């Protein structure tokens, strides 16, 4: 493979990532959509290690089966030892948050996780990271939501997270690869598409460029802070647990950020889902502003149920209630 130009840049990037995060004898998988980002990643990955390509067919477009089969054949031609089409079904209702996009993403990660035989390479780029940060800012769900995607979140690997989207596109051109153009990427009914096509270009124009890189740097800094607070929360937890609950007095002694991180982890371990910063702070008031108030409702993984975080006899507890 030509080591010059975009292909060479991608190869060096993936080699450096593998040297940092992957065992030397790891085989790996790559999630391939057929688009330029994942196609270029597949081309490079297959030259470096034994690679299995997984193409997830969500069945959301009339030609999705044909697109998936084309991508499968491309993967084999690029040197993958195996390439499989994995079919998933996305049925409404799509859930309370994120709609169709979130449901498709959840199904995709689930089927990739169930079929993988090693780390899974994902082709998210620096531009994807910037879009993710902006989405998190819009939701206002706390620092974690704007900390972006981790480069390495086992089994998920994102070796291109520091690379602009233009590089894999150029690599496909260098390799003579015909990448699939996902119509969703130009459909402005989707929030991420509008961010990509309208918001980010406007920010680049108004702020004089460098916005994508700046957003990604912000995500990295916040992610480092978030991971440190996670460590402090894990260290504090053994002295706070009261069976399946939490001692309110011991919680109150913790720094604010650490206390709320403990509460977040406790809620998630108890089956909470779709947590917002507002909900976590609401539960926090059961510790810091206790006046005998009622519990705080949060989403549950159980259909038709929600969880109620309450305080009884100085202990935070969780119980289920019908929606």
From Swiss-Prot:
The keyword tRNA processing applies. Its main location: cytoplasm. HAMAP family: tRNA_Ile_lys_synt (MF_01161). GO terms for cellular component: cytoplasm. GO terms for molecular function: ATP binding; tRNA(Ile)-lysidine synthase activity. It holds the Pfam family ATP_bind_3. Its EC number is 6.3.4.19. InterPro entries: Rossmann-like_a/b/a_fold (IPR014729), TilS/TtcA_N (IPR011063), tRNA_Ile_lys_synt (IPR012094), tRNA_Ile_lys_synt_N (IPR012795), tRNA_Ile_lys_synt_subst-bd (IPR015262). GO terms for biological process: tRNA modification. It is an enzyme of class 6 (ligase). It is found in: Cytoplasm. Keywords: ATP-binding, Cytoplasm, Ligase, Nucleotide-binding, tRNA processing. The keyword ATP-binding applies. This is tRNA(Ile)-lysidine synthase. Ligates lysine onto the cytidine present at position 34 of the AUA codon-specific tRNA(Ile) that contains the anticodon CAU, in an ATP-dependent manner. Cytidine is converted to lysidine, thus changing the amino acid specificity of the tRNA from methionine to isoleucine. ATP binds at residues 33-38. The N-terminal region contains the highly conserved SGGXDS motif, predicted to be a P-loop motif involved in ATP binding. It catalyses: cytidine(34) in tRNA(Ile2) + L-lysine + ATP = lysidine(34) in tRNA(Ile2) + AMP + diphosphate + H(+). Gene3D superfamilies: 1.20.59.20, HUPs.
């Amino acid at each position: 493979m030509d080591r010059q130009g975009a292909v060479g840049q991608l190869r060096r990037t993936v080699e450096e990532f593998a040297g940092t995060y992957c065992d030397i004898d790891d085989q790996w998988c790559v999630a391939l959509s057929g688009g330029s980002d994942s196609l270029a990643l597949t081309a490079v990955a297959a030259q470096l290690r034994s690679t299995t390509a997984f193409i997830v067919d969500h069945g959301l477009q009339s030609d999705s089966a044909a697109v998936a089969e084309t991508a499968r054949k491309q993967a084999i031609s690029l040197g993958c030892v195996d390439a499989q089409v994995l079919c998933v079904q996305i049925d409404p209702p799509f859930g309370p948050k994120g709609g169709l996009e979130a449901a498709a993403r959840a199904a995709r990660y689930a089927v990739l996780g169930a079929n993988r035989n090693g780390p899974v390479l994902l082709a998210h780029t620096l531009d994807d990271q910037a879009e993710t940060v902006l989405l998190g800012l819009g939701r206002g769900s706390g620092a974690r939501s704007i900390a972006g995607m981790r480069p390495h979140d086992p089994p998920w690997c994102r070796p291109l997270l520091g690379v602009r989207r233009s590089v894999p596109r150029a690599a496909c051109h260098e390799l003579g690869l015909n990448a699939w153009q996902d119509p969703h990427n130009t459909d402005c009914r989707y929030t991420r598409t509008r961010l990509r096509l309208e918001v980010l270009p406007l920010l680049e124009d108004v702020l004089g460029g460098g916005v994508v890189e700046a957003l990604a740097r912000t995500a990295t800094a916040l992610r480092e802070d978030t991971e440190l607070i996670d460590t402090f929360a894990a260290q504090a937890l053994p002295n706070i647990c009261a069976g399946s609950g939490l001692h309110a007095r011991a919680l109150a002694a913790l720094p604010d950020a650490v206390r709320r991180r403990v509460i977040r982890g406790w809620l998630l371990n108890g089956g909470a889902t779709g947590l917002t910063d507002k909900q976590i702070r609401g539960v926090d008031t059961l510790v810091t502003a206790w006046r005998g108030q009622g519990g705080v409702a949060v989403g549950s993984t159980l259909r038709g149920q929600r969880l109620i975080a309450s305080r009884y006899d100085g202990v935070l507890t969780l119980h289920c209630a019908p929606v």
